[in-house]
Swiss-Prot record:
This is Phenylalanine--tRNA ligase alpha subunit. The lineage of its organism: Bacteria, Pseudomonadati, Pseudomonadota, Alphaproteobacteria, Hyphomicrobiales. Binds 2 magnesium ions per tetramer. Keywords: Aminoacyl-tRNA synthetase, ATP-binding, Cytoplasm, Ligase, Magnesium, Metal-binding, Nucleotide-binding, Protein biosynthesis. Its EC number is 6.1.1.20. Tetramer of two alpha and two beta subunits. The keyword Magnesium applies. The gene is pheS. Coiled coil: none annotated. It catalyses: tRNA(Phe) + L-phenylalanine + ATP = L-phenylalanyl-tRNA(Phe) + AMP + diphosphate + H(+).
Length: 360
């Protein structure tokens, strides 16, 4: 029994001294393997008398269990130490300075920048963004917006129509984002307060027009909205967008099928050596159209005009981008010229914010 105790102590000391899993495995094989020291003792039990076998067997198995437990405990310690060492060797110093961005990094397109700017401004006023498909029905693009049959906008020379269907109806590329207003009024109950930015299409191409362009429209429907509210919203938007503390606006009577009364809006400006300065001078620039939503439009969208009223406006995102950032030709916005974009574009990490000033 004393020899067994000595063997047990020796093996446990070897387990404790094992410096890695390979050394620990060698100790296990030497003690518990087929030819191991404890396995050899277990093999002698068959030659003992029944009484000795009972006594020696219990002692040998107890020693085997202690060695097995010690091996498992040491293996856990070694695995934990190995993991700690690996983590220490792979540590990343997060205090290292950032690498400078390459000079040829991409730029944010002025249209994307202006889109973000106006969305931020109107969101600050409580507006949400509504979207709709570019391919629309004649009903949503014209009929529900009070365009009469024979209106010039419904002709082939102004609008991109698809081939007629078997029933005679025609799909088209939307000529404005007003169909999004229609879809909103059909799907939501008042009060409604949305802006509708998106791509629009018309058959036109020159320095100030392209077949595909961008618009943003706004819509407010409730029981008490009036032109005074519309004027305030547009005034606050223009001040924030053009970054001036004061700006004069001029509202002129106009006509749109979907609003009554209809107005066009000019803003005060001064041309100075090729630049346009807003909020001063004696010149005026037209920037948008607006008005009170026509009762026929409300009825077509399932809203009772005797209970609800509202106003809408629309402006070209491309146009206000040109005015703000001094872009002379609308077609340059769509030329995919890297040199032009490197001049007019915005660095991704230097995006203007409403709080910090909209221009870089």
């Amino acid at each position: 029994m004393s020899d067994l105790a000595t063997l047990e102590t020796s093996i446990l000391d070897q387990v404790a001294a094992a410096g890695d899993e390979a050394a620990l495995e060698a100790v296990r094989v030497a003690a518990l393997g087929k030819k191991g020291s404890i396995s050899a003792l277990l093999a002698t039990l068959g030659k003992m008398s029944p009484d000795d076998r009972k006594t020696q067997g219990a002692a040998i198995n107890q020693a085997k269990d202690k060695v097995t437990e010690a091996l498992a405990a040491r293996r856990d310690v070694l695995k934990s130490a190995a993991l700690d060492a690996r983590l220490a060797s792979e540590t990343i110093d997060v205090t290292l300075p950032l690498r400078e961005a390459p000079t040829d990094a991409g730029r944010i397109h002025p249209l994307s920048q202006v889109w973000d700017e106006l969305t931020t401004i109107f969101a600050d006023m409580g507006f949400s963004v509504a979207e709709g498909p570019d391919i629309e029905t004649d009903d949503y693009n014209f009929t529900k917006l009070n365009f009469p049959e024979g209106h010039p906008a419904r002709e082939m020379h102004d609008t991109f129509f698809f081939h007629p269907k078997e029933d005679g109806s025609r799909m088209l590329l939307r000529t404005h984002t007003s169909p999004v207003q229609v879809r909103t009024m059909l799907s939501q109950k008042p009060p409604i307060r949305v802006i509708c930015p998106g791509r629009t299409y018309r058959i036109d191409s020159d320095a100030t027009h392209t077949p595909q362009f961008h618009q943003v429209e706004g819509l407010v429907i409730d029981k008490h909205s009036h032109l005074g509210h519309l004027k305030w919203i547009l005034h606050e938007f223009c001040k924030a967008f053009f970054e001036v503390d004061h700006i004069n606006m001029r509202f002129r009577p106009s006509f749109f099928p979907f609003t009554e009364p209809s107005l066009e809006v000019d803003i005060q400006c001064r041309r100075d050596k090729g630049e346009i300065r807003f909020g001063e001078g004696e010149d005026w620039l037209e920037i948008l159209g607006c008005g009170m939503v026509h009762p026929n439009v409300l009825r077509a969208c399932g809203i009772d005009p005797d209970e609800y009223q509202g106003f809408a406006w629309g402006m070209g995102i491309d146009r206000i981008a040109m005015l703000k950032y001094g872009i002379a030709d609308l077609r340059q916005l769509f030329d995919s010229d890297v040199r032009w974009l490197s001049h007019y574009g915005f660095k991704p990490l230097e995006v203007p914010t409403l709080a910090g000033g909209l221009s870089s």
